[in-house]
Every structure is written in C-alpha cells, then in structure tokens.
C-alpha cells in the first residue's frame, strides 16, 4: 500500500527495501502472471495458467474477469417454454451451504428452481458416485491423484505432465450427475452452479461437454436472483436430494479423502488388501509440494487430494462468502443428510433410475 511504501521510504530513502508486488501476481501460485517490462501491464502466460480464478478474486480493479454464460443460460431457460420443449436442470455444488449466513441450503435450492429450472439436483450426489468409483480405481492402481478440481488437474497437466497418468479417470461430480441426467432424460440441458471459475473450462472438455451445457458461478446466480426479484430468505425450503454426508463434504478440503476412505470401508477393502494414506492439499502451494515429492519419489502417501483453492471449494473465487464459518456450514449440511452412507446414497440413485 502507499502508506506502507511511505514508511519504507522514510526508513530507506534509496528504496532498497521496497518491493511492490501486484495483487494478481501475488495471488497466482501457479506463477502464470508476470509484469511486462515495457508496458508495465500484467500478462497471463496461458501455458502456465490453470484457470483457478485466484487473480480474479484478488484484483482490486476488476481488470481480470471470467467469461460469463449468464445470458446463454437465461436464453436456454426461456426457450424451453416452461420446460415443455425440453427440460433444464441445475446441478448445484455442495458449497452452496456456505454462501449465505442465515439462509438454509434448501431455500437457496428453492430460489434456483424459481429461476425457471425444471429441477435442482445436488452435485454432491455425483460426489458419492465419484468417491465410490475412485475408491475402486485406487485399490486397483495403488496410487492416484484426484480429478474433481479442474484447476488441480490443469496444474498437473501443465506443470507435472509426467504425473498426468496418475490422475483419476473418473468424471468430476458435476459431470457424473449430469451424465446420469442426460441418460435419464434424453434431450435435457444441464447448467452447473458453483464457486468455481475453472468449471467454465471443464464444461468444454471433450468428455464433459456432451453432458453439461454451461457453468455459472454463485455470483452470477445471485445476479439472476436480483434481476428476477427473488428473495431467497423468504423462500420455503425445497426438498433436498439423497446425497450422503460424504458427498456433501467434498466442498471442503479433506472431504474427498474422507469420502474415499469411507467408500473403501463400505466396499469391504481391508487394510491388508489396501491401506489408504492420503495427503489433502489445501491450495496450489501444498499441491505443488506433494507433486514435487511424488516426482522425486519421496511421497509416502498413495492418494493426493488436490484443491486449488484454500479451504477447498468453499474458498472458490466466485463464492459469495469467505469466512471462518464456511467449513462448519458445509459440515452441518453434511450431517443433515438423510442417507447415512455412500452405498445408501447410491442405492437411492439406482432407485431413482428405475422411475
């Protein structure tokens, strides 16, 4: 800041101890942003950028923005003819539980449906499926890195390409539940709503784009609420789906590893057959440390849970709230689940398939 710079100037008139680092450069743990010496403008190195959105959140001037699909989503809903021409589903990230201080997740879900969606589905249900499949894959391959966070996946592919073969082959929770919706309701359209800017890139992946039409953020969701005059605080509570506690806590760091551990237990995998030893990386700096250890053959753990955002998805750049209560809110959301296990959630999922 200028005040701090003035202090340094008084202490050292030669500016020998003054170092100005722009917020975007400081925020980019992937080291993808640099200052052009001639123009003095910040430049993003696309070969290093992982689309985590940290620079977007930290820039005080709004000089860096993500590409919005809000108008396309509105058109998609309008052209559905009240979901008679085709149905539009909203898949909502479990970090929805931490977006508002005194508003229940069920009220937010009701507000989203009031935007014109045919139904609102928990991405956490997809997380249950991913935890189950990832546990099976891990027990077979003996080492994996998670695939749920697209920014973490990008970081491996760009920074540690030799480790890319260890990335889980499973779809993300968003894509997993969207695929189920497409199979259940042929011709439907799916919109993901969450805290993540990197998801906007993920929906363009070859294996994802056939399931998810658009990804918008919680900030864009709130803009749609405001535009349509929806006061979520006054909404009646909508009925939530059948995601388990373990699927819902994917939203915070450590939740994915806990879910995989539970899935291994429910699958009857004993410690003798395979003992899970996970490292949960809280932010890109910790991801880098774990990947460097793996690269050098020094990593003792057999599963890397990578979260590009500190805190996990609850620390995403497009969250409406960033405070100490967020983890507790997500944990409470998990405890409110009607399903006590991942297998119960998957059974409910299979029962829903038969309808």
Label each residue range with its predicted role.
Residues 1-2, 15-18, 144-145, 153:
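Non-ligating segments of multi-cofactor redox enzymes
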Residues 3-8:
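Short, small-residue-biased leader/transition segments that mark boundaries at the very start
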Residues 9-30, 47-61, 147, 194-202, ...:
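Local cysteine-cluster metal-coordination motifs and their immediate loop/turn environment
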Residues 19, 40, 50, 103-104, ...:
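Residue-level recognition of alpha-helix initiation/capping sites
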Residues 27, 31-34, 47, 120-127:
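Charged, flexible boundary elements
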Residues 35-36, 66:
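Short beta-strand "wing" residues that participate in macromolecule-binding interfaces
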Residues 37-43:
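Short linker/helix segments within small regulatory modules
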Residues 66-355:
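Iron-sulfur-associated redox domains of electron-transfer enzymes in respiratory
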